[in-house]
Each structure stands twice: as structure tokens, then as C-alpha cells.
Amino acid sequence: MSTSERPPSPSSMAEDFAVEPLSPDFGFYLRTTELLAERHSPVQHIEIVQTPLFGRAMRIDGCFMTSEQDEFFYHEPMVHLPAITHGDPRQALVVGGGDGGTAYNLLRYPNMERVVLAELDRDVIDMARTWLPKVHRGAFEDPRLELHLGDGRAFTGNCKNQFDQIVLDLTDPFGPAISLYTRDFYRACRRALKPGGVLSLHIQSPIYRSPIMARLLASLRDVFGVVRPYLQYVPLYGTLWAMAMASDSADPLSLSATEIDARLTQNGLIDLKLYSGGTHHALLNLPPFVQTLLSEPAYPIDDGNSLDDINLDPREAGKLKLIQT
């Protein structure tokens, strides 16, 4: 056990409420019953908490990342929509994703030969490995998984035409992850992809974080020929969430529901909880208010740009408390 990790104590097991702001004006709370583990790594604060609703959940710098009960709401559309669109991914890169859930879903493809997990913080992997087996499901023991500890941007920049699929499974765009949300980094991802390769990432919420969502899409569209945003409600995130798939040629809108279901069956993916041929197109079918949002001018994000006006960092919100009446 790391000296910076503390085990549960009687005081940490008392019922509590974790409050997470989504904007300066809105947030949500989640009841927690036990602090299972906690570390202050060199780059961030990591917690594993027990919750009645979601089971074990991971928080990083005050933001919920994943949980045992609802991880599929995030991991399945993030991985399988682009993978099925590609058709036969064999080499994949995950930037971030230290909980192992994305790697597990990629490794489910029988033709997958290699998955590289580039994670900045070894403590995230260690804590997930110990406390979240229902999320990673043994992915860290798969011989096809290759761990790279360190700067994911630097690693990606040294790759060229190596990967069929890249998944940016990142924390929110503040703190150590900020440099992974720029047009410059997306250019590095494009160079790292093979022809026909696919990229996916989450792009925040169209409801409470629409300015950053619009700018992220503008950044992607300046680099890739095909960019398709899609939507999924993630219970642990407290709101409607957005993701995007980008490629030079592969287009998720080109496949029928029948073709998608056939590819899922061919890969033995018959037990998914969310993603299917039917939900594929539902995810991509944006409501009018989102289409309007994305039709408005937005500026790409470049290295050195300040995102202070978007005000995403919950650490800047001050001490929040839940007031019960």
C-alpha cells in the first residue's frame, strides 16, 4: 500500500454525500457509505467509495469517473460504436482509461492483437486493479494489454500509422488532462492511426457544458474528414453526456442496424447491455437543440489556449455542501 493511501477508518465509514458541480449553477449529489481507499498521487486525488446505488465508484479530483453498476453506459458506446464502424480493429491505443473498462471492451474482439494503455498515473491503475474488478474484469492480466506509464500525448506523438482505433478515455479538460483536448493533439492522433482508423472520445455535456463541447467538435472537424457526435445519458455523471467518433473515411452513419448486429454477432458480442444495431443509430440521432448548438460558430482549441471562461474545474467552485430541508 502506498504511504499516501489510507485504509478505511471508522470515521470514514459514516454515511456521507458526495457533491459534484457540473457548472457554477448546477450539480448533483450521491450518497456514499464508505471510503474504501484514497490516494494523493503526484498529479491528482483518487478515491474509491462505496455507494448504495452504483456499488464501488472511483472519483478523481472530486469528479466521479466510473462505477461498478453503470460503467457500461460509458464504455460500450465509447468503444463499440467506433470499433464496429471500423469493422476489424486489431491494434488499439487507449489514452487514459486507467480503470481498465475501455481496455476490457477492446480486448473482447477476437481479432484484437494488441491494446496499449497509456496512463499518466500509475496510482489510478493500482487502485482500479484492487478495488474495481467488476469494471476491468481481468483486462490487466490479458497478455495482449501493454501498459505505458507516462505522458499519453508524448507517447501518441511518437507513433505513426500504428493503430486501427484510438480511445481518449480522459478526465475532464482541466488539470493534467488539458493538453489532450487540443487540435494539436488530435493531429498527433490522426498521424498515429492507420488509414481507415477511428478515434473516439467524450466531449462533455450539451446541457451544462455546451461551450466546451462546441469547441472540441470544432477542433476535431479541423483535423478529421468525418466527425460524428453522439449522445448518451450516463447516470453517474448526472446529465446527458456527449461523445464523438472521428476518422478520415469510416462513417458510423453508413451502416445499417442489420449490418451492425451481424458484426456484433461475428465478434461474439451478444451480451452487451446498451450498444446494438438499434441503439447505434439512436445514439447518433441528435435532437434539434443539439443540432442548433453545433451549427453555431466555435473556435478550435490550441495549445496554450485558456479555458478559464468555461469554468469546468470543480476545485474552483469552493467548498460545497448539501442542505437538507
From Swiss-Prot:
State the active site: 169 (proton acceptor)
* Documented EC number(s): 2.5.1.16
Superkingdom: Bacteria
Q: Which UniProt keywords apply?
A: Cytoplasm, Polyamine biosynthesis, Spermidine biosynthesis, Transferase
Q: Which leading EC class covers this enzyme?
A: transferase
An example GO BP is: spermidine biosynthetic process
Hey, which pathway is this one from? Amine and polyamine biosynthesis; spermidine biosynthesis; spermidine from putrescine: step 1/1
Per the annotation, which location comes first and is thus the protein's main one?
Answer: cytoplasm
- Provide the residue positions that the database annotates as binding S-methyl-5'-thioadenosine: 44, 119, 151-152, 176
Q: Please provide an example of a Pfam family that matches this protein in its UniProt record.
A: Spermine_synth
What residues bind spermidine, as annotated?
75, 99
The PABS domain is annotated at: 11-248
* Subcellular location, record wording: Cytoplasm
Q: Which GO terms describe its cellular component?
A: cytoplasm
Q: Which one of the record's GO molecular function terms can you name?
A: spermidine synthase activity
What Gene3D superfamilies does the database record attribute to this sequence? Spermidine synthase, tetramerisation domain, Vaccinia Virus protein VP39
InterPro entries for the chain: PABS (IPR030374), SAM-dependent_MTases_sf (IPR029063), Spermi_synthase (IPR001045), Spermidine_synt_N (IPR035246), Spermidine_synt_N_sf (IPR037163)
Instruction: Give me the reactions it catalyses.
Output: S-adenosyl 3-(methylsulfanyl)propylamine + putrescine = S-methyl-5'-thioadenosine + spermidine + H(+)
**In which family does this protein belong, per the annotation?**
Belongs to the spermidine/spermine synthase family.
Task: Quote the function comment for this protein.
Answer: Catalyzes the irreversible transfer of a propylamine group from the amino donor S-adenosylmethioninamine (decarboxy-AdoMet) to putrescine (1,4-diaminobutane) to yield spermidine.
Q: Cite the record's note on assembly.
A: Homodimer or homotetramer.
UniProt xrefs under NCBIfam families: PRK00811.1 (NF002010)
Name the UniProt record assigns to this protein: Polyamine aminopropyltransferase
> By which gene is this protein encoded?
speE
